Amino acid sequence: KVEDNDELRRIIDSGDFGAWRIFLHPQQREYAEKSRNGSFRLSGGAGTGKTVVAVHRARNLARANPRARVLLTTYTRNLADDLASQVHQFSGAQTVKRLGGSGVYVSGIDQLVWAIMKRARSGIADAVKDVLGHPREDPLKSSDVSWDQAIDEAGRILPAEIATTAFFEAEYETVILPYRVTTESQYLSVRRQGRGLSLSRARRMAVWKVVAAYRSAGRAEGGTSFAERAAIAAAWLERTGQHLFDHVIVDESQDLTPAHFQLLRALVAQGPDDLFLCEDSHQRIYGQKV
């Protein structure tokens, strides 16, 4: 552990890049070490050390309780691999490969979803119905259905600003999936807070026709999209009440979707140090504001 500026100077002079990557400035130590009564969000700009805080916090929680199950996750597999390599920089620190095992489990969010659905096996069927309204032959199979196809089939009456893949992807991921909307009547009454574009009843009905076409094609194909799998995994965890982790730490949380957050919430029971989110709200690349 780097204790002060003199230690930082020693690291710089020695050229120890590994130590530099996990250098924790004294001003950051509170966030890495302080116990919280519940969930906590750490927000800061690029280069403020949020990732280092996340890595140190995961390691500290695992050291404080060797039986603790600690999840360290982020949006992409590459970022997760980088987090794992930083954890391994600590003397004697290791990551675990088994989902729900004691220690620090590092994974990209989509890989985490996959592991949860593999764990659920046939028990995932009810969760699929909760989210999509109908079963899928192989929920782990990646779907090739596109929104462009559904719009061409059922969205010809929609105005140009709505008849786009970008609109439907966002509507699906921020409204339909997290609220588990499976029927037109549900969609006509669901809240669309934060979407920035109001829809009349007639427009909602027209939008739903496209969603129905998209889901019908997905059902015929038998697979699911990444976004659908995240919502399905969250629904399964909620159904079973399985809390696979004691602590969940998220790096780059600004890039996650509402279904991802539902998943993370379901992974850990509410309590001390349950959820710790590190975000840069000015660098939202993939997700939408939650």
Question: Where are the regions a protein language model picked out?
Answer:
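Amphipathic alpha-helical interaction segments
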Residues: F167-E171, K209, E228, I232
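Short coil/turn segments at secondary-structure boundaries
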Residues: A46, E184-V190, E221-A231
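Conserved adenine-nucleotide phosphate-binding loops and their immediately adjacent elements
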Residues: V2-R21
